[in-house]
Amino acid sequence: MAKEKFDRSKPHVNVGTIGHIDHGKTTLTAAITKVLSKHNPKIAFRSFDSIDNAPEERERGITIATAHVEYETANRHYAHVDCPGHADYIKNMITGAAQMDGAILVVAATDGPMPQTKEHVLLARQVGVPYVVVFLNKCDAVEDAELIDLVEMEVRELLNKYGFPGDDLPVVRGSALGALNGEAQWEAKIDELMEAVDKNIPLPARDIDKPFLMPIEDIFSISGRGTVVTGRIERGKVKVGEEVEIVGFRETRKTVVTGVEMFKKQLDEGLAGDNAGLLLRGIGKDDVERGMVLAKGGSITPHTKFKGEVYVLSKEEGGRHTPFFKGYRPQFYFRTTDVTGVATLPAGTEMVMPGDNVALEIELITPVAMEKGLRFAIREGGRTVGAGTISEIIA
């Protein structure tokens, strides 16, 4: 049977469920597919067990169990990630294995916000998940409506505390299990939730609409023509004759792109996703090196000091066998290159164990083009021992 063609007519959005263990994230994911499959026979219902027994994947050497579910509403196509274990969520969010354009925060009305609720909301803020919609689950198990009001207030306060618009974002009250069991009043709440997701999680900006950026992978001298740098265009587009900046390692310089080449053919412009060679005016082979980036003027700047949200690989994942302490000095791998840096541990933390997640302050020995949300790896002698996301730039 031929594979069904991916329908590009509907805009695509990536979402995920977050929240405390046993608050009903996976049950909700299953319930969404069940209710939507009633409206649209093309949508596959995914049972709780099929989502809960998610296969383990390796993302940059880190083992993460993630279930990928897809469904659509009248207006959009969604890819939805759900993780069986708490550690899987942490790894997923920090490594960006599954980028989320928005999250559905699941809180059991029977419990209210719990430690992992807070941890997931904080991480969502740190790694740049931009929008949150709340589903108060298990409302069928709470007889006193005032108790649900209190839980809703607590959730809104928690979101405010971590920089989300807690007073304004939608909170839907429901029962994922009730909906999964086909109870009409709770099925209607799943429809209400998906309407809230449709309305409150905006379409992400497409990579091609963002300012041009290409990490430099290789440099060639072409006699009589000049210097060509190659790499994969990460975002935006670049036209022949455009001025760009070379950012990272040294003083930022301006140059003009005098040629764009792909597969030995000359092009007028290079687009996000293209593996391209760019000919640069007035630049010698020694003026550029791997790890610098070419970018639209003023769109990105070089820095050495930043805060990062980091997951340290466990021994089983091929990470360190021992903890590290203050003054830890590994390599930090950004885009295409390693730069040495020193890590400062949070106040009151003596050491960091393999398998931990931790907020580090890092100072690099040379400046790198960076911005909040950029992912990086931590390496020792070419071996990955950690993964992180920049949560704040200091200097």
UniProtKB/Swiss-Prot annotation:
GO molecular function, one term: GTP binding
Binding of Mg(2+), residues: 26
Binding-site positions, GTP: 19-26, 82-86, 137-140
InterPro entries documented for this protein: EF-Tu_GTP-bd, EF-Tu_GTPase, EFTu-like_2, EFTU_2, G_TR_CS, P-loop_NTPase, Small_GTP-bd, T_Tr_GTP-bd_dom
Keyword Glycoprotein: no
Enzyme class of the recorded protein, top EC level: hydrolase
Cited Gene3D superfamilies: P-loop containing nucleotide triphosphate hydrolases (3.40.50.300), Translation factors (2.40.30.10)
Catalytic activity: GTP + H2O = GDP + phosphate + H(+)
PROSITE patterns attached to this UniProt entry: G_TR_1 (PS00301), G_TR_2 (PS51722)
Chief place where the protein resides: cytoplasm
One Pfam family per UniProt: GTP_EFTU_D2
Region (G1): 19-26
Region (G2): 61-65
Domain tr-type G positions: 10-205
Region (G3): 82-85
SUPFAM superfamilies, per database record: EF-Tu/eEF-1alpha/eIF2-gamma C-terminal domain, P-loop containing nucleoside triphosphate hydrolases, Translation proteins
Alphabetically ordered keywords of this record: Cytoplasm, Elongation factor, GTP-binding, Hydrolase, Magnesium, Metal-binding, Nucleotide-binding, Protein biosynthesis
Cellular component aspect of the GO annotation: cytosol
Protein localization: Cytoplasm
The enzyme's E.C. designation: 3.6.5.3
Chain spans, region G5: 175-177
PANTHER family: ELONGATION FACTOR TU, MITOCHONDRIAL, ELONGATION FACTOR TU-RELATED
Quaternary structure and partners: Monomer.
NCBIfam families cross-referenced by the UniProt entry: EF-Tu, PRK00049.1, PRK12735.1, PRK12736.1, small_GTP
Family designation: Belongs to the TRAFAC class translation factor GTPase superfamily. Classic translation factor GTPase family. EF-Tu/EF-1A subfamily.
Name the record gives this protein: Elongation factor Tu
Gene: tuf1
